[in-house]
Amino acid sequence: MKLKHLIYGVPLAVLLITAGSSCRKAQFNINRNINQPTDSSVTYDVVLPAALHATGTIIANQWGPIQNWMSYWARSGTYAPNVIEETYQITTGFGNGIWNSCYDNNYDYQIVASKAAQAGAGFYEGIARIMKAHNFQVLVDVYGNVPYTQALKGSANPTPAYDNGLAIYQALLREIDAGIALIKAAVVTTTNANKNIATNDIMFGGNKTLWAKFGNTLKLRLLIHAYAVGVINKTTEIGIINTEGSGYLGVGENAQVQPGYKADKPNPFYNTYIANTAGTQTANNVYYRANDWGINYYAWDGDPREARFYVAGSGGLIGVPYGLPPITANASPVLAGIGPGVAKTNASPQAILTSAESFFLQAEARHRGWITSGPSAATLLNTGIQESFTYLGAGSAAGYLAFNASYPDVDYAGVAQGPGGPVGGLFTILSQKWFALNAVNTLEVWTDWRRVPYSEVATKVLYNNSNAPTTNFVYGDGGAYTGTTGAPGPGPFRSVSPQITTADNIPVRYLYPQTEYNYNTANVAGQGTITRYSKVFWDLN
């Protein structure tokens, strides 16, 4: 891993929250090499709130290309094509912000964890350990094998070895357990090492139960990702969660950071995709417009969330095909843009993991028989749908559920709409995750697209990671299997770039950054030949 300079973060009172997509942090009168992650001039209570904000910035700002690939957004005709992205011919220079941001952020959490451990501040240490696990999950899901065991060692090991993705996942499960235990055991007073946790914990305000629920939900996400990997015993792991006893994030329990965002220190998603601190429209707001397949799918289902994910342009709620040349595509003002449900205000909290996603994860675990008591998979699914509506400000989901009764992309008991079409169950859960996580947590949607094998959903191919665009069936189609006029076809739709070849399809991973090949040469070379179609360990398609 290339050794870089880290600028440590400070609380919002003196924190300059920037709009940069690599979540660099404000200056704290030091600019030290990350080989010194325990510098005496910073303290764990100072670093924690800035680190949590930085995690929110990662979730907010790093996923534009995947928003496009998953058919939510597309480039407007106002801009020239991004040929590398729109033909899927990504390079070692593509998307490096995810790698850099996650490792930078984890150096901060390492500072918190190590210094808090020395001080006996178990609450702070526990939070840092859970959040490090969150970021390593992101890294594995994007890159596969990554430095883990030898990472964050500073000058003791400037060229860390890579760990197997499965081994990292197994370690993360135990790391989260340790974090939960530390938090639950922590004694908080106004004078001891855990003081001010209610203020410095900008996600849950020092609420032990919510941190335990978040940790358990994060563990469930890991288990769902690796559902087909037998080495991880799902029954055992669910048993550990049940024994801990806090459960998962529930109704209204969104994991989101709020350090005090406001006009001059805005929410990172709003500041990147809507307007800057002066209130001026950002370039990203002009660039990213509605994808026509995605927006039409919401419309086909009569989904009120359409007007929350998108805001009408001068042409109404219309989109543009991904990869369409500028000479053909509509200019940005004509097309629908990023809507008020995800870009609420500059003062809104930034979501890390929503209650809607928590219920979708629980629904899949119930569907697979891992969770054996409590609400049914259908009830958990419908609760997740309502939580999505609530988060987006879309009101009640009751009318939407009634309108789409028996349709398998909405109704867990839905029936096939044509010969060979999908039925309810897992298809419904995954379809609803696609509907709900638009610009909320796009990585999870890309992960679902990659992880589910063809045999999982009735007789119809739901996910296809092959490079054959003619069989690129992915999510639900709202009835198009019957050939209904106006119904959206299967998707996400492949790019329509005229420069694409028949060998090009949506990548199943990012490539390691070029800096790894430059500075950690032997270890990255040990991973073999990596292409955009080299699979993450849980991708068994």
Features from the language model and the residues they span:
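Membrane-proximal, proline-rich intrinsically disordered regions
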Residues: 23-72, 100, 115-118, 469-473, ...
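Bacterial N-terminal signal peptides that target proteins for export
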Residues: 2-10
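Active-site/pore-lining binding-face segments in mid-to-C-terminal subdomains
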Residues: 381-478
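Structured, solvent-exposed acidic/aromatic patches
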Residues: 41-45, 77-131, 135-396, 415-426, ...
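Hydrophobic helical h-region of N-terminal Sec-dependent signal peptides
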Residues: 11-17
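C-terminal motif of bacterial Sec signal peptides marking the signal peptidase cleavage site
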Residues: 18-22
